[in-house]
Structure formats: C-alpha cells, structure tokens
Amino acid sequence: ILLTVLLYQKPTLLIKRLMKGYMVFLNSWISIVYYMIYCGDRNYNYILAIFWGIIALIWLWDLITNYTPFERYHKYDKLTYILYAMPFLYPLLSWARGMEFPMMTTCVMPCSVAVFTIGLLLAFSRKVNLLVILFLCHWALIAFSKVYVYKIPEDLLLASATVPAIYLFFKNYFDQNLHKETKPSAKYTNWILIALCVA
C-alpha cells in the first residue's frame, strides 16, 4: 500500500524501481512459497509455480530494462479504484461465507495479486508491458474454472473485472499506434478485440 501511495504522490525513479522490485518479490513468493510449498499436494502445482515464476522474471526484466515507465494515466481512474478495492473484498467475501484462515482467500494470494497488478498497470497505462497483461489475463480466464472446480465464487470478481481491463489495455495500445501501418488496420483490430472480450 505504501509503495502504491508513493507511486501516486512522488513517482521518482527510485520509487518506480522499488515497486518493480516488490512485484518481482511478490510474484516469486507466489511461485515458490505458495505453490511449491503450501500447495505441494495439489496436482500440477509446479505448472502454476512456473507460470508465476515467469511473471516474476518478466518483472525482473522490466526492472533491469526500465521498460514500463509508470507514467500516470487518469482516463480509467474509476475502474482502477474498483480493482484496488478487490484484494480487500476477497477476504471479506471468504469470511462472509464462513471460512477462516488458511481456507479463506487473503490479500497476497494469486487472484488478489493479479487484480491489484491489473489495477496498477491500468492507472499507469501510458506504456505497459503487455506480456505481464497477457499472463494475468490468462490467469483471470483460469479463474472462471476455479469457481466450479474449487468452489471459490470470489474468483468471479477477478474474472469479471479483467474483461473490461483487457479491452482497455489493448485499445490504449492501438490508440497510441494508430499512425503506424498494421495488418489488419487498427480500426478492424479494435472491433476484433471487442468481439473477443464479449465472447
């Protein structure tokens, strides 16, 4: 929370690098501690550990190359604040369902981190690492199946919130590159993107 506030108030190069370092740590923690240790009994836990490990490596690459500048973008503030609130709604919904730790969803579990990251990148979306977005949106689609398989209705929050975010990220990307020649054209790509998000 402190780094996020500082990123809004004093977006210095040091704060931006600290936020990226925190994202490396957080995604590595999910990969190693959460999936390899605490979820060791689950089937295919190592695949999920690799998935989150790749996201950690993408953030590490971003930290080294300074690809994502974290430039503030006010266009999607309302959706951003909703996404920021969701990691705190997750535990409340679990608690309302009568669950207690360690069975309840917490703020540092994969879905909560995915929602927070999408909100953060949407707030600073002048230029973002689309690879991180693609991985997180893929994770959000997996969340639909988790609702039924693991009986976690809270994951509907992640899945439903990411669909408009996916559209906005790519629309923003195409809007910034309208002057460039693309096949198909940016106009048709935008319509394809709308169709995919609706589907």
Language model features: what each stretch is:
Residues 12-24, 73-81, 125-136:
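Membrane-interfacial loop-to-transmembrane alpha-helix junctions, especially the N-terminal start
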Residues 1-40, 199:
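N-terminal topogenic module of multi-pass integral membrane proteins
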Residues 42-119:
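Membrane-proximal helix-loop-helix units in multi-pass membrane proteins
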Residues 24-30, 51-60, 114-120, 140-143, ...:
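Alpha-helical transmembrane segments and their membrane-interface exit regions
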Residues 185-199:
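Internal/C-terminal transmembrane anchor helices
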Residues 37-41, 122-134, 141-155, 174-184:
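Membrane-helix boundary connector in multi-pass membrane proteins
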Residues 44-49, 148-164:
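Loop-to-transmembrane alpha-helix initiation sites
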Residues 25-33, 84-95, 136-148:
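Aromatic-anchored segments of alpha-helical transmembrane domains
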